[in-house]
């Protein structure tokens, strides 16, 4: 049994090493580069591929994998929106993901960043750097006085709800697929418009689908309370970035914490020190005191990386042995 893993980072290698020791019957090849048309031939002779990347898995790459006899593909992440689904179906590829590598990791950072915005931490850091130790005018807000609207109440959304409740915030939620326990608590509102009208903080925990592309746009912002806070630790395409800038300029949005950006693949996880970033929209957001940007690192904890490697590799082994996997993704 042979599995090839692409785009293996240095920080992932210890977890691959652990998995290989636990599964001595599996031969594993680790490739540091992303899966592309140029290196897909490395998969020849392997039974499965374990992959991670934001870059698209194109029809060309998937067809070449299938031509090499590799029909079992395990993603070390949640999202499958960068897969060419028609090719997946046409070639009968088995796909698995890691549906919940660490909900707490993402929920914890979203709340952490919100607290920095509410406590004016970025502004105080600037003042302290200049030895300005005055308080005013940067007075803070308390989370326990606010209503938090959680869009998407899956594993991550529910972890965030628990943390927000711990701070004493009122929490309301919206999800097309409601959680039975949360529904018993009466937490859900019936429409997004209701959530926009009531929430002081809006946090996104939904996947990137056609139906929610730019779900936070000018129309959505217009329905929100003045001075709302926006948290996006899900997918960059959920927010129309230019409309967010306008909402920040008008004061409709008081601040935003973003761990994703719709054109992030050109920027995130790259060392751009001393270089000019020519994305004007990104730089507009990046240079604001009331916008906190992290480079898609909400997931990035030891627990999460361990789970990403072990769950994906276990699923690939299951595919090879049985043709099915616990985390198999079905495409209707």
Swiss-Prot record:
CDD domains: LDH. The keyword Phosphoprotein does not apply. The active site is at residues 235, 264, 296. The keyword GTP-binding does not apply. Gene3D superfamilies: NAD(P)-binding Rossmann-like Domain. Its EC number is 1.1.1.28. It catalyses: (R)-lactate + NAD(+) = pyruvate + NADH + H(+). NAD(+) binds at residues 155-156, 175, 206-207, 212, 233-235, 259. Keywords: NAD, Oxidoreductase. GO terms for molecular function: D-lactate dehydrogenase activity; NAD binding. Belongs to the D-isomer specific 2-hydroxyacid dehydrogenase family. This is D-lactate dehydrogenase. It comes from Lactiplantibacillus plantarum (strain ATCC BAA-793 / NCIMB 8826 / WCFS1).
């Amino acid at each position: 049994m042979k599995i090839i893993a692409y785009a293996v980072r240095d920080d992932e290698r210890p977890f691959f090493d652990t998995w290989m020791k636990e599964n001595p019957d599996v031969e594993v090849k680790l490739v540091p580069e992303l899966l592309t048309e140029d290196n897909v031939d490395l998969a020849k002779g392997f039974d499965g591929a374990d992959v991670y990347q934001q870059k698209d898995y194109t029809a060309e790459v998937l067809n070449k994998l299938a031509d090499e006899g590799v029909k079992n593909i395990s993603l070390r992440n949640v999202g499958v929106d960068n897969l060419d689904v028609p090719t997946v179906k046409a070639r009968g590829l088995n796909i698995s993901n890691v549906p919940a590598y660490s909900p707490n990791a993402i929920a914890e950072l979203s709340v952490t960043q919100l607290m920095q915005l509410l406590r004016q931490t970025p502004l105080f850091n600037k003042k302290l750097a200049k030895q300005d130790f005055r308080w005013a005018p940067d007075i803070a807000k308390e989370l326990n006085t606010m209503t938090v609207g959680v869009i998407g109440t899956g594993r991550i959304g529910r972890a965030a709800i628990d943390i927000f409740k711990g701070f004493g915030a009122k929490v309301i939620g919206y999800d097309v697929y409601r959680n039975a326990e949360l529904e018993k608590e009466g937490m859900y509102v019936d429409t997004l418009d209701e959530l926009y009208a009531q929430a002081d903080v809006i946090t996104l925990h939904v996947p990137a689908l056609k139906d929610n592309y730019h779900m936070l746009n000018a129309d959505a912002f217009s329905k929100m309370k003045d001075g709302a806070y926006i948290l996006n630790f899900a997918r960059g395409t959920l927010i129309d970035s230019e409309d967010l800038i306008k909402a920040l300029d008008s004061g409709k949005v008081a601040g935003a914490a973003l761990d994703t950006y719709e054109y992030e693949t050109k920027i995130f996880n790259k060392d751009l020190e001393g270089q000019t970033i020519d994305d004007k929209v990104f730089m507009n957001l990046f240079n604001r005191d009331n916008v906190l940007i992290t480079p898609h690192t909400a997931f990035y904890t030891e627990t999460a990386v361990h789970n990403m490697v072990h769950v994906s590799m276990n699923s690939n082994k299951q595919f090879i042995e049985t043709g099915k996997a616990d985390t198999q993704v079905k495409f209707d």
